[in-house]
């Protein structure tokens, strides 16, 4: 029988409190009770008897405006905020204990990283002192510097100078890294201790927080948030004042420090300084700011709108992909595994420095002790590689894919911001982009990227606190980690599909039945389920990159070892960068025909030094012909010309030793971070260098002339000698693009014996004046010339008379003989590749020439400054009809979209309406389909194919928009289930946030004092340690945006859009997550305490 139909027992009375709450009076015992006496007949007595969401006798659910839902146990007269029906609190305790184990491992790994860095710093300081002493002793005698072997790097003045600068830079960099790592260690140590105390406190408290205790915790949290808001305002004021101070200093990146060199180093380079000019012969390559004529105004608007809508769709797709990846990730768990890989990398760097350290002035005991430490370190590294799990590699691949998606999202947001400003400035009469009714608007209700959806930069919210928007490693560390785990994955690289992340080592997740979150929390699993693929078309083991941009995954393809940081097409990148080669024409270049690794002739551009001496080793090498064809997927061997005899220049033994060894190198310049990347991929046909048995081979790379304060010399790890060696090592140099054009890349193949004596067998010198600024990666093969052969040629007697046509050496004779034929063949091949492989202008012009001409203008401006003669023979593709004097084909008349015939009834994304079918009775004209915009919804001039219902008395009569029915909202918005553990974590997190903010404010105040002192002393440039630190360079970049807001308006808008996109990804992740949102939120809260967010770096130590 229902309870309302049951009468109250005798002696009981129902009454109401002053706030309307019902209570019951027992007149017999003269007591009051909140429990209805009839409940003992209708309610279950224990939780075991409860069905569905019932509460047992004596329990009541109540609501507090501040705390939310809480529960009252009238039997014990206590309150609690945990739901007694859900064992979520117990699951939280288990998750916290498991995370403490992971955090302890990460902390111990980072402590070991700090110790290894300390050893590296000690070795670097010893090496710098020894090299500096050698330089001082040998500085006065140039003869003693070159009296030894010219192949020994320790006695080469240029290499020795680069060694000293590199050692100094390494010491300063290691000092800065140790200061930063020390602060990270302190943060993680405090966070670990905080989590440990929370675990102990919550384990002792059986009932958790009561209602009054929870209210007190929330009041304290709110007070700390107010203090954080005030601190953020103070921080912003300090940043503004620093921006004003920084504006008074000169921050030219192309200063003399980047171009620091001696006269000998400039003379030694066989590449001349490039001419700084713009080719304005036709006046069609000058990129303007969309200043089109009046007749192209409409076409320009349409083109920009199309690109704008396409970029918007790309951003939406990238956000969905990022949300899917984040929903499968464990926040904080990957950090410990990444730290272990970083530890392996640091040990490898230490091992490399132990191998290449100079043994001068070392006692025999010190050398033996160093050798023992090196062997012990080799064993540790081998054991660490053997224990690397497959699931770890898979998780790191997904993390690298996420970083790639974040980079694509940054590019897309910058493109949208630029297009938005261009559309606004193009015409004031076009439809406003900020209208909320437009489906493609920046401020639309769904997927908004506008600044209006952003919270204030000084407000404190838990979304900003726990979710770090797109935190990434720095570029150098990211490349090392990716190459490290990619190298470890080669041992078990499967031929078929790769298994999921946790398939082999983690229990699978049970599906949550029903839609209730309470039931989902009752069947919690400790690990999220991983998806096999994010797209039905994606293949994790595909040998070639996918065609769709939505599933681009270069790190999971066969080209991952060659392009760890790039996602564009390799063929397109190589072809585009090749178009920019060889434009100077100021140096006499010849073609050299040499047998390749497979016995096929190679084409090489080389310049022969006129003299013989120490500088003869600086031989410039260019890309071979076959390597370009191989990169494009088509291999065409160079035809051997009749009548050309190699015996005329070389004998049979020496012909294979000269120029036959090749090295594959990828070059890329990152314009955003001002960094130049060098990727040493592999070395082929090493036997041509006459290598001895049981020798280890490494490649030494030097950027000459060396900068005064940057690392400019690198060495790969030594490998056992073989005919083909695969290195896959990347090196990063911080340098400006104008300074890079003045540099030369010297590549040497060296061997090292047990006494740490380095001997160079062969090398090449590559000009960096042709590096693409657009960020395209160019991969090429370079031929290496043997130093032994060159020394032998130098020892031959030279003729005394002046050189003439009859008095040239054998190499020059061969070069002059083959130059004309090679040039002709190269011209034909380059023109065919240019027309067929990279540019597809004819197809685009056939569709819409007026739109395509303007669209290609923004994509070609990178390659218009220096164009090869082969590329100039191609037909003109961009034409300014008002200034160009060449005869060009007449362009079709620009027409409006409604008058242009279309081949298919598809509507562009810039149109809001559907396709309009022209009425047959309207006019006797052609009865074909056309596209138009309607100004009225009830227009009788044409008929909608799917006419929407007419709304009478509508305010907007231009078009009828059906508003979505507003969903019926509950009186209280649905809250996440919160426990005492959640409240405690929130309280400690706000305390940590406030403490970190206080430290950042103190660092900014100290930095302000340094700049004020430097300004008072009359200094014109910023301090050197401030310009060299990567983190402070980012801070200076942010200060530049604060000062020149008009100049960096698009960048600021892009930053706002990225923050909005991060919040959208966070929101979408909660929708796509297969687990309850409470689980993901709790993991973020735990990870916050062990993942430092240092936006303002600590001041570094004093440099050398």
From Swiss-Prot:
Region (Interaction with histone H3): 836-1104
Residues with PTM Phosphothreonine: 921
Disrupted gene: phenotype observed: Deficient mice have significant deficits in hippocampal long-term potentiation (LTP) and long-term depression (LTD)vcand have profound learning and memory defects.
Post-translational modification comment from the UniProt entry: Phosphorylation at Ser-542 and Ser-923 by CDK1 in response to spindle damage stress regulates mitotic exit, these two sites are dephosphorylated by CDC14B.
Domain WW: 6-39, 53-86
Record-level GO BP terms: cell migration; hippo signaling; negative regulation of cell population proliferation; negative regulation of hippo signaling; negative regulation of organ growth; negative regulation of transcription by RNA polymerase II; positive regulation of MAPK cascade
Residue ranges, annotated region (Interaction with PRKCZ): 945-988, 948-967
Protein name listed in UniProt: Protein KIBRA
Organism per entry: Mus musculus (Mouse)
């Amino acid at each position: 029988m229902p309870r309302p139909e049951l009468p109250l027992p005798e002696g009981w009375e129902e009454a109401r409190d002053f706030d309307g709450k019902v209570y019951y009076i027992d007149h017999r015992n003269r007591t009051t009770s909140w429990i209805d006496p009839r409940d003992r007949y209708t309610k279950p007595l224990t939780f075991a008897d409860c069905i569905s969401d019932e509460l047992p006798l004596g329990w009541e659910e109540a609501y507090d405006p501040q705390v939310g839902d809480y529960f009252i146990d009238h039997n014990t007269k206590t309150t609690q905020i945990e739901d007694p029906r859900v064992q979520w609190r117990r699951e939280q305790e288990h998750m916290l204990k498991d995370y403490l184990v992971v955090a302890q491992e990460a902390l111990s790994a980072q402590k070991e990283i700090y110790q290894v860095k300390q050893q590296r710093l000690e070795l670097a300081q010893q090496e710098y002192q020894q090299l500096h002493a050698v330089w001082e002793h040998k500085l006065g005698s140039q003869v003693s510097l070159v009296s030894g072997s010219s192949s020994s790097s320790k006695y080469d003045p240029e290499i020795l100078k680069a060694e000293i600068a590199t050692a100094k830079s390494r010491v300063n960099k290691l000092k800065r890294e140790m200061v930063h790592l020390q602060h990270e260690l302190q943060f993680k140590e405090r966070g670990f201790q905080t989590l440990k105390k929370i675990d102990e406190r919550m384990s002792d408290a059986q009932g958790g927080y009561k209602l009054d205790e929870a209210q007190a915790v929330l009041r304290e949290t709110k007070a700390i948030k107010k203090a954080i808001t005030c601190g953020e305002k103070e921080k912003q004021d300090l940043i503004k004042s620093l921006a004003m101070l920084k504006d008074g200093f000169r921050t030219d990146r192309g200063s003399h420090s980047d171009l620091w060199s001696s006269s000998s180093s400039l003379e030694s380079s066989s590449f001349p300084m490039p001419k700084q000019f713009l080719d304005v012969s036709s006046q069609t390559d000058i990129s303007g700011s969309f200043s089109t004529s009046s007749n192209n105004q409409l076409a320009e608007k349409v083109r920009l709108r199309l690109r704008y809508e396409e970029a918007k769709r790309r951003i939406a797709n990238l956000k969905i992909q990022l949300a899917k990846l984040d929903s499968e990730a464990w926040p904080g768990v990957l950090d410990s595994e990444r730290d272990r890989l970083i530890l392996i990398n640091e040990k490898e760097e230490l091992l490399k420095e132990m191998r290449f350290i100079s043994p001068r002035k070392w006692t025999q005991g010190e050398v033996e002790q160093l050798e023992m430490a090196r062997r012990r370190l080799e064993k540790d590294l081998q054991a660490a590689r053997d224990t690397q799990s497959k699931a770890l590699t898979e998780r790191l691949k997904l993390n690298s894919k996420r970083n790639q998606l974040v980079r694509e999202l940054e590019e897309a947001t910058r493109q949208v911001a630029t297009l938005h400003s261009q559309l606004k400035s193009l015409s004031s009469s076009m439809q406003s982009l900020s209208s909320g009714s437009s489906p493609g608007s920046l401020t639309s209700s769904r997927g908004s990227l506008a600044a209006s959806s952003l919270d204030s930069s000084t407000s404190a919210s838990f979304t900003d606190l726990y979710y770090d928007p797109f935190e990434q490693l720095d570029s150098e560390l990211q490349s090392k980690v990716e190459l490290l785990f990619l190298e470890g994955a080669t041992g078990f690289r499967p031929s078929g599909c790769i298994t999921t992340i946790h398939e082999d080592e983690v229990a699978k997740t049970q599906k949550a039945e029903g839609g209730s979150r309470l039931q989902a929390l009752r069947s919690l699993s400790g690990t999220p389920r991983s998806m096999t693929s994010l797209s039905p078309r994606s293949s994790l083991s595909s040998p070639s990159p996918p065609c769709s941009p939505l599933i681009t995954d270069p790190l999971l393809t066969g080209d991952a070892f060659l392009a760890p940081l790039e996602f564009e097409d390799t063929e397109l990148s190589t072809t585009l960068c090749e178009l920019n080669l060889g434009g100077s024409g100021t140096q006499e270049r010849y073609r050299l025909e040499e047998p390749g690794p497979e016995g096929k002739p190679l084409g090489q551009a080389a310049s022969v030094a006129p003299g013989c001496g120490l500088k003869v080793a600086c031989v410039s090498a260019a890309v071979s012909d076959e390597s370009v064809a191989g990169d494009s997927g088509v291999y065409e061997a160079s035809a051997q010309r009749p009548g050309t005899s190699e015996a005329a220049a070389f004998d049979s033994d020496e012909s294979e030793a000269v120029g036959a060894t090749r090295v594959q190198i990828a070059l890329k310049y990152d314009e955003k971070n001002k960094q130049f990347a060098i990727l040493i991929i592999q070395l082929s046909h090493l036997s041509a260098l006459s290598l001895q048995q049981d020798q280890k081979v490494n490649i030494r790379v030097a950027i000459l002339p060396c900068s005064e304060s940057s690392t400019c010399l690198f060495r790969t790890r030594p490998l056992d000698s073989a005919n083909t060696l695969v290195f896959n090592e990347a090196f990063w140099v911080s340098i400006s693009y104008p300074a890079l054009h003045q540099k030369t890349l010297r590549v040497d193949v060296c061997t090292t014996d047990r006494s740490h004596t380095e001997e160079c067998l062969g090398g090449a010198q590559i000009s960096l004046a042709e590096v693409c600024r657009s960020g395209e990666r160019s991969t090429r093969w370079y031929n290496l010339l043997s130093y032994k052969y060159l020394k032998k040629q130098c020892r031959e007697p030279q003729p005394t008379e002046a050189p003439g046509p009859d008095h040239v050496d054998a190499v020059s004779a061969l070069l002059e003989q083959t130059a004309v034929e090679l040039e002709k063949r190269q011209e034909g091949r380059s023109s065919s590749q240019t027309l067929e492989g990279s540019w597809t202008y004819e197809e685009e012009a056939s569709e819409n020439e007026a739109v395509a001409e303007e669209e290609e203008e923004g994509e070609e401006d990178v390659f218009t400054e220096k164009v090869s003669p082969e590329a100039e023979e191609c037909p003109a593709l961009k034409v300014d009809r008002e200034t160009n004097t060449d005869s060009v084909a007449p362009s079709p008349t620009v027409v409006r979209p409604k008058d242009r015939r279309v081949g298919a009834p598809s509507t562009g994304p810039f149109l809001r309406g559907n396709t309009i079918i022209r009425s047959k009775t309207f006019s006797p004209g052609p009865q074909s389909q056309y596209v138009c915009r309607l100004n009225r919804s009830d227009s009788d001039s044409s008929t909608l194919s799917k006419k929407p219902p007419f709304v009478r008395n509508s305010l907007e009569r231009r078009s009828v928009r059906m508003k979505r029915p507003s969903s019926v909202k509950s009186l209280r918005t649905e809250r996440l289930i919160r426990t005492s553990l959640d409240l405690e974590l929130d309280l400690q997190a706000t305390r940590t946030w406030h403490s970190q903010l206080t430290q950042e404010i103190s660092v900014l105040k100290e930095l302000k004092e340094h700049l004020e002192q430097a300004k008072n002393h009359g200094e014109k440039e910023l301090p050197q340690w401030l310009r060299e630190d990567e983190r402070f360079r980012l801070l200076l970049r942010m200060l530049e945006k604060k000062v020149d807001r008009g100049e960096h308006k698009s960048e600021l808008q892009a930053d706002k859009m990225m923050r909005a996109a991060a919040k959208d990804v966070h929101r979408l992740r909660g929708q796509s997550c297969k687990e309850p949102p409470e689980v993901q939120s709790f993991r973020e809260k735990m990870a916050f305490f062990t993942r430092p967010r240092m936006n303002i770096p600590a001041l570094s130590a004093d440099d050398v």
